[in-house]
Amino acid sequence: MKLLTTICRLKLEKMYSKTNTSSTIFEKARHGTEKISTARSEGHHITFSRWKSCTAIGGRCKNQCDDSEFRISYCARPTTHCCVTECDPTDPNNWIPKDSVGTQEWYPKDSRH
């Protein structure tokens, strides 16, 4: 897996975590049945929509991801993938703040730090 793809994925997880007080979308997918079982015993039902989750982070549900995209998870069924476009490393909006690693500087995502 390319470094750029890995960093984009980490940025998406951080972005989602900051906008929600609960765990990341990927953790919810892994622990969904655990939460549903607990909720049912309390009389509440939790619905996890993979399609809505995919589109919430800018992904698209498709049968096959393009070369410029990477697959995060499947959508409604295992043959439909959540495809997210790779970030452009020359766009400053795609840079990650170094304060996430202890400083206040910015660096391009594809550089080694």
Swiss-Prot record:
Keywords: Antibiotic, Antimicrobial, Defensin, Disulfide bond, Secreted, Signal. It is found in: Secreted. It comes from the Eukaryota. Disulfide bonds join C54-C82, C61-C75, C65-C83. InterPro entries: Beta_defensin_dom. One of its GO terms (cellular component) is extracellular region. One of its GO terms (biological process) is defense response to bacterium. This is Beta-defensin 112. The lineage of its organism: Eukaryota, Metazoa, Chordata, Craniata, Vertebrata. The gene is DEFB112.
